[in-house]
Amino acid sequence: MTIAFQLAVFALIATSLILLISVPVVFASPDGWSSNKNVVFSGTSLWIGLVFLVGILNSLIS
């Protein structure tokens, strides 16, 4: 169970860093938002899901 928690935390951190870099780049590009809107929403949905997963796994471990 601890390994699953650690992997979920790592995935959350990695997703956060990717979104931290990619979202401003998408907004700064001239036609970025209209062409990459689905990618940003998918990344945000993944991030929210990982937040809940880490919370659930944390409650099971401690």
Swiss-Prot record:
GO process annotations (BP): photosynthesis; photosystem II stabilization
Subunit structure: PSII is composed of 1 copy each of membrane proteins PsbA, PsbB, PsbC, PsbD, PsbE, PsbF, PsbH, PsbI, PsbJ, PsbK, PsbL, PsbM, PsbT, PsbY, PsbZ, Psb30/Ycf12, at least 3 peripheral proteins of the oxygen-evolving complex and a large number of cofactors. It forms dimeric complexes.
Subcellular location: Plastid, Chloroplast thylakoid membrane
One Pfam family of this chain: Ycf9
The UniProt record lists the keyword Ribonucleoprotein: no
Family under the similarity heading: Belongs to the PsbZ family.
Chief site of localization: plastid
Membrane topology: Multi-pass membrane protein
Keyword annotations: Chloroplast, Membrane, Photosynthesis, Photosystem II, Plastid, Reaction center, Thylakoid, Transmembrane, Transmembrane helix
Transmembrane segments: 8-28, 41-61
Protein name as it appears in the record: Photosystem II reaction center protein Z
GO CC annotations, alphabetized: chloroplast thylakoid membrane; photosystem II reaction center
Primary role: May control the interaction of photosystem II (PSII) cores with the light-harvesting antenna, regulates electron flow through the 2 photosystem reaction centers. PSII is a light-driven water plastoquinone oxidoreductase, using light energy to abstract electrons from H(2)O, generating a proton gradient subsequently used for ATP formation.
